[in-house]
């Protein structure tokens, strides 16, 4: 099902343990995006925890940074680096496969989008199709991310959760997120499973 973790500017970054747990519970690849110098920088396609943690550590993120992390469980288009998240907001499908990209706006998704789900689709995920066919036509400028009516319309179409970041470091969330000491999680798979044995 995936998980999104959004760290807005002024909030802590997730711990290494939290990152590890999210990857362990959503093991089909990871990525992240951050805003700097008016652009969103996306790095994705990390298919193992070590390469992901190395990349994140090299960024030296602090509470000043606005960062969205994503960990995937594949529901369409298989397990591959290209369909990990985040994606650039674009109307061109070929842009969805870029592993390292700068763009005005980036998107991460959690859930299944029935509108664009197609079990026979082997190349593009429901998220990639939703972004190119729907979102790219709806979001035209940075102010759109602060338009509650537009975000509600996107939520009704997607039927799931999204984090959308623009180059100004603003993060809009669509759907209900869990606030855990400032971090926003799209579900509870950031928590370690705790087993209790009863004698």
Residue map of PLM features:
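Acidic loop->beta-strand submotif enriched in PP2C/PPM serine/threonine phosphatases
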Residues: 77-104
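A short acidic, glycine/proline-enriched capping/turn motif at secondary-structure boundaries
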Residues: 49, 73-76, 94, 112-115
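Histidine-centered active-site/metal-ligand motif
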Residues: 70, 85-86, 109
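Short histidine
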Residues: 114-175
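Short acidic-glycine loop/turn motifs at beta-strand connectors
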Residues: 34-39, 91, 165-170
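Conserved beta-strand-loop-short alpha-helix elements that form
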Residues: 103-118
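Extreme N-terminus nucleophile/cap motif
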Residues: 1-57, 67, 158, 176-199
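Regulatory input/activation interfaces that engage signals or partners
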Residues: 65, 70-71, 75
């Amino acid at each position: 099902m995936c998980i999104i973790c959004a760290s807005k500017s002024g909030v802590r970054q997730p711990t290494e343990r939290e990152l590890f747990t999210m990857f362990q519970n959503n093991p089909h690849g990871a990525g992240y995006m951050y805003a700097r110098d008016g652009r969103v920088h996306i790095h994705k396609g990390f298919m193992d925890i070590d390469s992901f943690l190395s990349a994140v550590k090299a960024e030296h993120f602090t509470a000043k940074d606005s960062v969205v992390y994503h960990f995937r469980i594949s529901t369409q288009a298989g397990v591959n680096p290209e369909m990990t998240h985040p994606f650039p907001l674009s109307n061109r499908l070929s842009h969805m496969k870029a592993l390292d990209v700068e763009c005005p706006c980036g998107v991460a998704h959690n859930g299944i989008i029935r509108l664009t789900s197609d079990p026979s689709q082997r190349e593009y995920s429901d998220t990639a199709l939703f972004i190119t066919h729907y979102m790219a036509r709806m979001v035209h400028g940075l102010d759109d991310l602060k338009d509650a009516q537009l975000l509600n319309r996107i939520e009704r179409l997607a039927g799931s959760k999204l984090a959308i970041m623009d180059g100004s470091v603003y993060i809009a969330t669509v759907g209900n997120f869990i606030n855990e000491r400032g971090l926003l999680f799209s579900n509870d798979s950031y928590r370690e499973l705790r087993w209790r044995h009863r004698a």
